A protein has these predicted regions:
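Low-complexity, acidic/polar, glycine-enriched regions of mature
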Residues: 21-216
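Sec-dependent N-terminal signal peptides
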Residues: 6-15
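N-terminal secretory signal peptides that target proteins for export/translocation
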Residues: 1-3
Length: 216
């Protein structure tokens, strides 16, 4: 076979493969991911940093699903939520204040949620026969204390294809997500009492959310 013919054949095979591949390799279409403790314990950690006091806490009562659109990752979506009263800071008295009307008002607004509308700035970090990893910005709406505000979160997604090893944890493909973002308490009408916000409680609360799930 002449070199020119070989070049044409290789080029044809290359472009044929890539025409069928997506940003997630051979994964195609929409994949719905449900949180599953068998894969790992999903957790939302929150951090308050102020001049007089620093503290952190977490919720391990996350719920929700999200859909990864392998054909167009930008069009992925979903919702993650957790009860206000599941947030624990290590001090029960502080937690009781946090749940109160001046703060998160858990009685009137029992849930905190993040609705993902799309991904942007997607960068594929790894893609092979076992998994795909990518970073992106998840854009959507955070709802807290009855107020909904546009929010962006930096995310890192690891998508592991089903294998005999993964089946030992859960069926389907396994998905792990690490998300980081910050919320301004004032933006969500969380005012506290007196001048506590800005002195003993940070004006902005940082969140680090880790999600573990599997495809249906």
């Amino acid at each position: 076979m002449h070199m020119k013919s070989i070049f044409i054949l290789v080029s044809f095979l290359y472009f044929s493969f890539n025409a069928n591949a997506t940003q997630m390799g051979n994964v195609k279409g929409k994949r719905t991911v449900s949180l599953n403790n068998s894969v790992g314990t999903s957790i939302a950690k929150f951090f308050s940093n102020s001049p007089l006091e620093k503290f952190e806490g977490n919720s391990q009562s996350l719920q929700g699903t999200f859909t990864l659109n392998a054909d167009q990752l930008e069009q992925s979506s979903g919702q993650i939520a957790f009860p206000v009263t599941s947030m624990k800071s290590g001090l029960s008295k502080r937690d009781d204040h946090m749940y109160g009307k001046d703060w998160l008002d858990a009685k009137a607004f029992p849930m905190i949620s993040f609705d993902v509308k799309k991904f942007s700035g997607i960068t594929i970090k790894k893609s092979d026969n076992s998994s795909v990893e990518f970073s992106a910005t998840a854009e959507g709406t955070c709802t807290l204390k009855g107020s909904s505000k546009p929010t962006k979160a930096k995310i890192y997604v690891k998508y592991v294809f089903e294998s005999e090893n993964t089946k030992k944890r859960a069926s389907g493909d396994l998905v792990m997500v690490d998300a980081d973002f910050s919320v301004s308490l004032k933006d969500f009408n969380v005012l506290g009492k007196g001048d506590i916000i800005g002195t003993k409680v940070g004006e902005n609360i940082d969140l680090d959310i880790k999600l573990f799930g599997n495809t249906n």
